Amino acid sequence: MKRSLELAEKLIHQSYLEKEEYMELLGSYQDKETVVCLGQEAARLREKYYGNKVYMRGLIEFTNFCKNNCYYCGIRRDNKNASRYRLTEEEILDCCKNGYELGFRTFVLQGGEDPYFTDEKIVDIVKKIRNSYPDCAITLSIGEKTKESYRLYKEAGADRYLLRHETANEDHYRHLHPEQMSLANRKQCLRNLKELGYQTGAGFMVGAPGQTLECLAEDLIFLKELNPEMVGIGPFIPHHDTKFADEPAGSVELTL
């Protein structure tokens, strides 16, 4: 049996690999036999836990203002070409009303790290959604906050929180973010969310500038340690108004 298939079988049976093994397996992402083996196992697990159901989420992107300056992001603070907007509380609640009538039972409030939306504003919005739709799940995706802020949102009625770690490798994190931002803080935010009882989502880009197979292996090891309820993984897509505009997009095959 070829080495990549051996590693795939090992991953299937024990649910983890060592870093060097992950790197070796990821390096064989174009090997058809290995891809088929892993794809069949992924399909088996999907069928086991979700069957053939498709779960719809009502995504409300309520602000694209952001105080951060992440080098890969189209809504980064210094992008003067971005057309900025904020939804009012009334507009957000109207979106929920329309979504509920269409059958949505999960609302995801997503936005940049916008100082306008203080803890008080977020708590008020979450409480109103919770009181109006007690049978719905409320997910937030609004970036890095203090543990106390996360606690307030949870007490107001939020159930889930999405915060992609983007990369678990310190050097790679520095390549993608300005020095004011911290990978250690990003990871601590995720741990705080877990401790507070949120269903927590992490995740990363595949093919981001400066990323190596070692970076990807460290991402997988970090996720095993964190054990989030949700993981979002997608290929890097270069944005025309960032310093990475001319970088190649990430590989869909490697992402899968």
Where are the predicted features?
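Conserved SAM/AdoMet-binding glycine-rich loop
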Residues: F104-L190, K194-Q199, V206-P209
